Curated annotation (Swiss-Prot):
UniProt induction comment: Induced by BasR.
Main location: membrane
Keyword Cell membrane: yes
GO cellular component, one term: plasma membrane
Protein name: Phosphoethanolamine transferase CptA
Organism: Salmonella typhimurium (strain LT2 / SGSC1412 / ATCC 700720)
Keywords per UniProt: Cell inner membrane, Cell membrane, Lipid biosynthesis, Lipid metabolism, Lipopolysaccharide biosynthesis, Membrane, Transferase, Transmembrane, Transmembrane helix
Gene responsible for this protein: cptA
Role description: Catalyzes the addition of a phosphoethanolamine moiety to the outer membrane lipopolysaccharide core.
Family, similarity comment: Belongs to the phosphoethanolamine transferase family. EptC/CptA subfamily.
Length: 577
């Protein structure tokens, strides 16, 4: 009798486990594998989708005899969520994220209807059918995964502990992070897996929305600038501010770099007298949010919190009677980018062109060209347009189309001693600069084609060290170990003939002035003809009263952390520092 019972006891099957894994992985990992194989992002999403899809094995291990029912119920939820995410990727080439939720909730009913109607195409129907058939076929292959007691409980707990409980315990009790930050970190890891991209996306969206609304309400409560006057006349005009990303001028041929990385801007500079190139502008912070909190407000290194207590550039232009626009190819609703969204919401109309889940994904700045043309055609008599680019942000090869790697494999004008990976990054950065040149030049040309009355100013938020400074082993930005290339930025001004005729200025004597972009609001006010209490013409690079001052860099919130940029040692004399 005992022998018979032993023979009929169900045995563990690796094959059954394999089919169960394939089934649950299918709903998340297929999309992440496509994203990775097509070169649109790295391996993090693929890794996390594999890990967190494995959580669905727990009920399968605990109740092996009901695997078909459990898998069917869970599968319907996973199928619906993953099909929506897959369809979104097929249409837009982007992952679903909290930024998508933000854009969807910000649209009106008609826009939302148009947005959703794009799903009902023949292509999407065929994708949905194939996807559904594959899911059903995998479901039919499922068999019970028998794990003897007590191992089934131990294995199930190990999965739960390793993926959920351990990260929470480590962050909360060992690293002493708040529960909010702990859950936010866990949510970002779970996001690539269905249906967590919707659950965590909504959680993160609500979290950032609360912070966003608090900052916007505080901004709305600020008093307007006192004794405000616009001396530029009443003629219709369009003023444009283009903000780049991670672009150091030392790698631009426009500034003397031997590789031809900016051919279109080079040509414009030679042929168009309206383009002025300023040669000695630096940023105060090597990070996007931190510098824009200064460049777009009255804050600076000595008064870093004034962005919270004084009006911004966007507030100022609305006070001057401009209809204001914000066009961005940066991510929208992320913990890091909430302040950017706050700035954007201070304008009348926003265009959010990048809803990627991660910044390290293929997204091209050509996205901004169509909405820019549309805004130029807006009938408002006074328009102020901000265009925020991804520029040359790391990962550099994701900033330009794959077939436009002009400098791939090149070794000319390369620092000595670079490894093959470092050489690839060095060349990728030059390729990204080349594409950035096309985008910035296109914006200038599209603006010029409207025969505008106004000006366009372009600068990059900060620079980037890409093995430029000896010993040529540093890539990126580190405020605690600064190099000149992290802070040197392009600063270009294109003035239309109409604006120049009405407001004649000669900038030829200004181009070599030492300047910090943290003072940008004073230069912008000067160019736009705006005065008010707090405007300081000595802090405008284009004003005859300009006075050079110490260009502070560093973290203003750390004691004794500010240093004079001009005391930094020079690297190799390549390009402009």
């Amino acid at each position: 009798m005992q022998s018979t019972l032993l023979q009929t006891k169900p045995a563990f099957s690796w094959k059954a486990l394999g089919w169960a894994l394939l089934y649950f992985w299918f709903f998340s990992t297929l999309l992440q594998a496509i994203i990775y194989l097509t070169g649109y992002s790295g391996t993090n999403g693929l890794r996390d989708s594999l890990l967190y899809s494995s959580l669905w094995l727990i009920p399968v291990f605990l109740f092996p005899g009901r695997i078909r029912v459990i898998a069917a119920v869970i599968g319907v939820v996973l199928w619906a969520a993953s099909l929506a995410a897959l369809s979104y990727y097929v249409i837009y080439g982007q992952e679903f994220s909290q930024s998508v939720l933000f854009v969807m909730f910000e649209t009106n009913a008609n826009e939302a209807s148009e947005y959703l109607s794009q799903y009902f195409s023949l292509k999407i129907v065929l994708v949905a059918l194939a996807y559904t058939v594959a899911a059903i076929l995998l479901w039919t292959r499922l068999r019970p995964v028998y794990i003897p007691s007590p191992w089934r409980y131990l294995v199930s707990f190990a999965l739960l502990y390793g993926l959920i409980l351990h990260p929470i315990a480590m962050n909360t009790f060992i690293k002493h992070k708040s529960m909010e930050k702990t859950l936010d970190s866990l949510a970002s890891r779970m996001e690539p897996a269905a249906p967590w991209q919707f659950i965590t996306g909504y959680y993160q969206y609500r979290l950032q929305l609360a912070s966003l609304n608090k900052l916007l309400n505080e901004n709305d409560a600020l008093p307007p600038l006192a004794n405000f006057q616009d001396h530029s006349g009443d003629a219709p005009r369009t003023l444009v501010l283009v903000i780049g990303e991670s672009t150091q001028r030392g790698r631009m041929s426009l500034y003397g770099y031997p590789r031809e990385t900016t051919p279109e801007l080079d040509a414009l500079h030679k042929t168009d007298p309206g383009l002025t190139v300023f040669n000695n502008v630096v940023t105060s912070r090597p990070y996007t949010i931190e510098i824009l909190q200064q460049a777009l407000t009255f804050a600076d290194e000595k008064n870093p919190d004034w962005y919270l207590t004084k009006p911004s550039l966007m507030n100022m232009m609305k006070q001057a009677g401009y209809k204001t626009f914000w066009i961005t190819n940066q991510q929208t609703m992320t913990a890091r980018n909430t302040m950017l969204t706050v700035f954007s919401k201070q304008t009348d109309k926003q265009f959010y062109m990048n809803q990627q889940r991660t910044q390290s994904a293929r997204e091209y700045d050509s996205n901004v060209l169509a909405p820019f043309k549309a805004v130029l055609a807006d009938p408002a008599p006074k328009k102020f347009i901000i265009v925020h680019l991804l520029g040359t942000h790391i990962k550099y090869k994701f900033r330009y189309p794959e077939n436009q790697g002009k400098f791939d494999g090149k070794t000319d004008h390369v620092p000595p001693g670079l490894s093959s990976d470092e050489l690839e990054s060095y060349n990728d950065y030059d390729n990204a600069n080349l594409y950035n040149d096309y985008v910035v030049a296109s914006l200038i040309k599209d603006y010029k084609a409207t025969d505008p009355n106004g000006f366009l100013l372009y600068f990059s938020d900060h620079g980037e060290e890409v093995y430029d400074t000896p010993p040529h082993k540093t890539q990126g930005r580190n405020e605690d170990s600064p190099t000149r290339h992290m802070y040197t930025v392009p600063f270009l001004l294109w003035t239309s003939e109409k604006w120049q005729a009405a407001h004649p200025r000669d900038f030829s004597q200004d181009v070599d002035r030492k300047y910090s972009s943290s003072e940008l609001i004073h230069t912008w006010s000067d160019l736009a003809g705006l005065t008010y209490d707090g405007y300081d013409p000595t802090r405008s690079i284009t004003n005859p009263q300009f006075k050079e001052t110490t260009r502070w860099i560093g973290n203003p919130y750390k004691k004794n952390a500010l240093i004079d940029y001009d005391t930094l040692p020079y690297g190799d004399q390549v390009g402009n520092q």
